[in-house]
Every structure is written in C-alpha cells, then in structure tokens.
C-alpha cells in the first residue's frame, strides 16, 4: 500500500476528479477522505508528507470532510536496532493538522500499540548440524508464524528459560 502502482486507492488527481463529479450528487454523500500509506512506518516524514497531501486535497477541492481516515498506525520495533516512532511528535503533528481542520480523525492503532500483545512460545526439539550452517528445530512451524519465511520479517527471540541440557543431534 501507499504507492501509485499499488492495487488500492486512487491518485490525488483521480480522487479530485471523482470528488468534483460526485460532490453535488443527490445519491452520493461523500463524508470521509481515507488514506493509507502503509502499516510499518517508523519515522515521521511519511506522516508529514501524507498530511501535506491531505491539506492540498482539501484546499484544491474546497470540500469539507466530516472524517479523515489516516489509515495504518505506527510501526512496531521488531529489532532492538530499528527506529521507534516518537508518539509525542506524532501527536503534535496530528494536533497541528486539526487546528486548521474540523474533521474528525480516524486511524488504526498500529502494530506499535497492539503488536506486542501476542507471543509465540516454542521449545527446541533438536539442532541439525550441516557443513554450511546449523538449524535449530522447534516444535512450532510456519503456520504459527509465517511472516519471517514469507517476507523476511524479524522478531526478537527471548529465551523463557535457559538450561544447559544437551540437545540430541539428529540429521
């Protein structure tokens, strides 16, 4: 999501054309401008850019939207070295936008708020040693957490219990 070539959404130009065509319709009542630039954004610049695009749409169309849906929420910090979004600055950015706009804001809570609510608990069954690399075999599978295999997502691994028990070497 978030790019012109993606399957969802419209370009700003196309949206303005449709808004002009339908804003005086007796059958269609446009009440919401909905945008979605992505769901794993961890810095403020894309949000600033998004709000500037929304401002331009409102200025160009002179249309009063009852709601503005800002789409996906803030990204989650999957790795210790990844960027973490500053909630205070994000809040100030939205408040600044609202000072000049009377629309009600809608947005998803985002992974940064809800993503840590779940965890996968697994145990090591055995370790497979090969000439090129070693594999830790768990009692969990891709159906439990497909994201790393599907698109290389990273998740922290935290041992719940550390013991020095030997794990059998099966091949």
Question: Which residue stretches match the model-derived regions?
Answer:
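Short glycine/proline-enriched coil/turn segments at helix->beta-strand junctions
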Residues: 62-64, 99-103
């Amino acid at each position: 999501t978030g790019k012109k070539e993606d399957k969802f959404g419209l370009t700003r130009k196309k949206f303005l054309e449709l808004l002009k065509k339908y804003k005086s319709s007796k059958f269609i009542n446009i009440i919401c401008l909905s945008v979605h630039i992505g769901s794993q954004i961890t810095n403020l610049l894309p949000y600033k850019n998004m709000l500037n695009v929304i401002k331009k749409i409102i200025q160009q169309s002179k249309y009063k939207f009852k709601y503005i849906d800002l789409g996906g929420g803030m990204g989650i910090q999957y790795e210790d070295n990844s960027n973490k979004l500053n909630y205070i600055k994000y809040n100030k950015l939205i408040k600044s936008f609202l000072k000049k706009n009377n629309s009600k804001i809608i947005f998803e809570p985002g992974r940064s708020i809800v993503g840590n609510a779940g965890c996968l608990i697994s145990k090591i069954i055995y370790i497979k040693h090969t000439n090129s690399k070693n594999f830790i075999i768990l009692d969990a599978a891709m159906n439990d957490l497909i994201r790393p295999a599907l698109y290389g997502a990273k998740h922290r691994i935290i041992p719940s219990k550390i013991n020095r028990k030997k794990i059998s070497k099966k091949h």
